[in-house]
UniProtKB/Swiss-Prot annotation:
Gene source species: Methylibium petroleiphilum (strain ATCC BAA-1232 / LMG 22953 / PM1)
A GO CC term assigned to this protein in UniProt: 3-isopropylmalate dehydratase complex
The protein's name in its UniProt record: 3-isopropylmalate dehydratase small subunit
Enzyme Commission number: 4.2.1.33
SUPFAM superfamilies hit by this protein: LeuD/IlvD-like
GO BP field: L-leucine biosynthetic process
Pfam families reported for this sequence: Aconitase_C
Gene (name only): leuD
Record's keyword annotation contains Lyase: yes
Amino acid sequence: MQPFRLHRGVVAPIDRENVDTDAIIPKQFLKSIKRSGFGVNLFDEWRYLDHGEPGQDPASRRPNPDFVLNQPRYRGASVLLARRNFGCGSSREHAPWAIDQYGFRALIAPSFADIFFNNCFKNGLLPIVLPEAQVARLFDEVAAFPGYELTIDLERQVVVKPDGDELAFDVEPFRRHCLLGGLDDIGLTLRHADKIRAYEAERLLRKPWLANTLAS
């Protein structure tokens, strides 16, 4: 998992409340057994004028020119600005996969759905909760200034605006530690690889019959 320490990026606004996971990545794209390739279908039903199916070439489809991510001013955006209760609905981990694979590194909203919030951290995304008034102000500034960028400093836990104004946010210490170190669940487990190997060796000494069981 890619570490997250300091990130600066263009902000793309999704100006809707209660954006659910089916809007983030529609259900027909959940059939894939792979964990990659979801970014091209992020916000698929808003992003395209035609109905999409798994494996379809995005170049053959009709983009919706009015949707935020199709507008030139938001090209290359890596910070997603949203309204309250973002990520509600069914608990599909494909939603943060799609957001990450599109190229977003952080999300800012007044609130997130709990399961989606947890899944973001597990997949290297930083969901930032700010007061609603601050989020509303950011929406105004993004609309007023094309190419609007924010700098997100996870070590200091601040969002830095173009004018230097800083917005403080909180991240639970263990989650902050994992993001700073680029540690997902597998990475955390591998940090104890020596202890795991030592335990397995000691267990086989005590219970040698397990060797045949494990080999089969």
